[in-house]
Amino acid sequence: DEDEKEIVYPEYTRKDFLKDVYMSEEDYNRLTGVLCNKKNIILQGAPGVGKTYVAKRLAYSIMGVKDVERVKMVQFHQSYSYEDFIMGFRPTLSGFELKKGAFYNFCKKAEIDSDNDYFFIIDEINRGNLSKIFGELFMLIEKDKRGSELQLLYSDEKFAVSKNVYIIGM
């Protein structure tokens, strides 16, 4: 069927990363080792040095392809909340409606496609109130808690962060 053509993303390797990013192979191996082992990493540096550029290419190099569908980026700010990140009630014309947030939707997508790695990139992570944004999910992002289910604040639903979700903060 013509409508169901599979999208083929370009290959992206360690070699491509090292060519695109000013980093030694030793530093790259250390960085990917920590991220793959811990599932979460914080990239640190002055504004404008290319952390976003590095984060996306790091994800692509681990996936082996430039699959933009498996990489999601959000930017935290002082007003960013649990309701934006996980889920919360939002006003509608007829009252309030429970809306799912960016991280919730991303994790559900990754859960369905458990054979592939997914990368959630958080820009300006230091500007958000992490306890307020992550809420009860703070412990679920730890490597040894991946796959463990927890009851969500605004829903009877159980939620887990899949083992194939990696978080890159900066």
Residue ranges: model-predicted function:
Residues D1-M170:
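AAA+ P-loop NTPase catalytic core and its hallmark functional loops
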